[in-house]
């Protein structure tokens, strides 16, 4: 199958090897991009683990050399048992005394799978400091993404689910303790194995390994961004038609996930930007052909090949950041508009309730006089011809007067723009006719005295105000 399998001394018939190799080539080149292929393989693996039937197979094209954390020669052939498939993708439990990693040699062959090293021995063998191990050690805690150069020995990479050490002749990929990341890490190892086996040309080994890591990271960022755009975009489109409580709750959940993705993308972009701005780190990343960095030289060394590679992925990551930021702004704008609509509806309900209260108060006051009139007491108007009419008219006038005065007070404290029946804004007229109407008694009864009188300051007061503004002389 591959050299890595022969290194593990697994006896497989040559015909089976040829069939597997041809199938792998067809499987690798039938996809348009790495993202589509990874999504298809992830889907197959998920269906395999969750399907109730026993006919599920390992997705074609996945290297057995990295899927199985505990190799057994008799189990290299794909099996139909879904439990065995799950065990092959089982993550590694963190240990305080050991580190677990898979090693690729300079030809792309896997020389060790999930091999455990004592931490102190591992640090001494790779000329690392204990603080460096925190960035790459197997842990369930997410660490800030980083690419640290330890010239001239290695490059420490910690991006998303990938924690690796790149040397001039080998790559060490550390295992994960998170079950959901184990599958992603397996797909990355498959990509790394394929790319390291391809002809290198003039590209250094460490740059090919670093580019494989960046490709994997960008592919997963792109897939996550696509999911966020589809999910949030659908909810935003639905909220334009109807404001629903469940939709707002879903938008809140997706907004939190989008913010987390945005933060990760920004951190990765900052890592690439720091590398591009630091010539010393760029020089230290040349492990195969070391370059000595001298800051005193006026014309620094040209890192065109490395800068072009990093800049291309920096622009791609920056594009993801911009799209995610734009989507976050759309969500915030939608939230603000929804809040404005809800506040307007709430104020409309409060205004409607106040109007009902005003009318209720008017009718209550109007029935006060008839209540006195209807008492079984002598009021000296029982025999009057106009008594009933006078009481009725006076009660109605009294109720209308209370309603008018109440609406007058309500208009003074009302802050919203009132709408008339036709949907037009009610603006106060500034024409001469409107000013003349304001002087009428019934206009002042409904709307109050709108004329605000200001007394002009005296010359002495004007002088004091002028001195206060200019602060030229102390006040006397």
From Swiss-Prot:
Q: What's one GO BP annotation on this UniProt entry?
A: mitochondrial magnesium ion transmembrane transport
Q: Per the Swiss-Prot or TrEMBL record, what residue ranges does the short sequence motif YGMN cover?
A: 373-376
Coarse class of the primary localization is: mitochondrion
What are the subcellular locations of this protein? Answer: Mitochondrion inner membrane
Which region of this protein is its transit peptide?
1-20
Residue ranges annotated as transmembrane are 349-369, 385-405
Q: Which UniProt keywords apply?
A: Ion transport, Magnesium, Membrane, Mitochondrion, Mitochondrion inner membrane, Transit peptide, Transmembrane, Transmembrane helix, Transport
Tell me the InterPro entries matching this sequence.
Answer: MRS2-like
- Topology within the bilayer: Multi-pass membrane protein
Name the source's superkingdom: Eukaryota
* Molecular function terms from GO: magnesium ion transmembrane transporter activity
Claim: Transcription regulation is one of the keywords in the record: no
Please provide, in alphabetical order, the Gene Ontology terms of the cellular component aspect for this entry. mitochondrial inner membrane
Family, according to the entry, reads as follows: Belongs to the CorA metal ion transporter (MIT) (TC 1.A.35) family.
Q: What does this protein do?
A: High-conductance magnesium-selective channel that mediates the influx of magnesium into the mitochondrial matrix. Essential for the splicing of mRNA group II introns in mitochondria by affecting mitochondrial magnesium concentrations, which are critical for group II intron splicing. It also suppresses a variety of mitochondrial intron mutations and its absence may disturb the assembly of mitochondrial membrane complexes.
Q: State whether it acts alone or in a complex, and with which partners, per the record.
A: Homopentamer. Forms homooligomers. Interacts with MFM1.
Q: What is this protein called?
A: Mitochondrial inner membrane magnesium transporter MRS2
Gene expressing this chain: MRS2
